[in-house]
Every structure is written in C-alpha cells, then in structure tokens.
Amino acid sequence: MAVSIVVDSGRTHEDYDMQSPFTTFPPGTIRQLRPSDLPRFRDHLLRLDSESRRDRFNGMADDNYVASYAERCFAQGTTVIGYVEGDKVLGAAELHERPELPEPTGEIAFSVERKLQHMGIGRRLFERLIGNARGLGYTKLRVTTHPHNEAMKALARRFDAMLSFEEGETVGVIDLDPPVAGRRGFFMSPAERMFT
C-alpha cells in the first residue's frame, strides 16, 4: 500500500523554494517499487550526480555497473522503496537480505537526487524501510558508508544506529525491537497512527 504524501495537487518539487526552510513535504508518493519499476529505479540511480553516486556506492561506479546493479536488485528480491513523483523515481531505499549472518539481518542503502536532498525524503524512506524490515522478521539492520558521508551517518544516528569504523568504512547497526501494539512514533504505520 502506498503512503501518499501529496501536499498540493498539481505541484512538483520544483514549485518550492529550495533555499527557504521546507515546511511541507514535497509532493509525491513513497511506495514499494514493483518489478515494472525497474527502468525508473535504474534511471534514478543513473541520474545521481557524482558525489551522490559516490555516497550511494561507497566509491566510484560507472553507468554500466549502476545499470547492472539495479537489475540485480530486482532479480535477487531486494525490497526497494521509492519516492515517486509523476513517472520518476527520485529517491530510493533498499533492503538486502544478509543470510550469511547469524541473526536475521538486512543491509540497507539510500539514494536521493541532489535537488531533493535535505527535505526529509531520506528520513521518510528510512521509516518506511524499517517498517518493512520488521514485517519481514529482521532483527538487525546494517548500513555501510564511506567515513565522509556525514548525511548518511546523521540519518543512521537518528534511527539509533551504533556506528563503528571497520575496514575503511563506517558501519551502522540498528537493533530492531519487535513491533509493540500501541507504540507511538515513526515506526507505526499511518493506519496505526489514525487509531492512537
């Protein structure tokens, strides 16, 4: 089920003054991507500017690698949540299973196109991804990034990630508590929030 975040029908993110404090969320929808969304997801990753692409892939990644990566995500059953505006995916959160680890663990990754960064889209994608991870029975989430990706480290800390430095990368681990009936906060679904 898509979580609608349309603020003002007919407006796009370009209609907002990006320099002023953002008081409303950009129009669009955060939803799980379908198999037919593969081309939109791939195009989103290919549109990332060089810095955003380096942050997302922890280093340099050429177009061929990025296109192949997007196809692997969908072929291997990765959960991909997207911020979709019109017919474009402009942000994405990925949940990759790590079956080799002893506890049910997911590796997570995020990307938001430059023009929409620092508007709360990453946080909303993170919230939705945590809900999906809980629903799939994961007890831990891991995120890795290069040590200079301050935005990702701040986002991970916001969700109580324990950060450490391993083999040249910053690694964050989030312990997921099981869902608790009536829990308030950003891990509740919109439907749950309506009845609390």
Task: Tell me what each language-model feature is.
Residues 47, 55-104, 113:
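Acetyl-CoA-dependent GNAT
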Residues 2-17:
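Short, Lys/Arg-enriched N-terminal segments with co-localized hydrophobic residues
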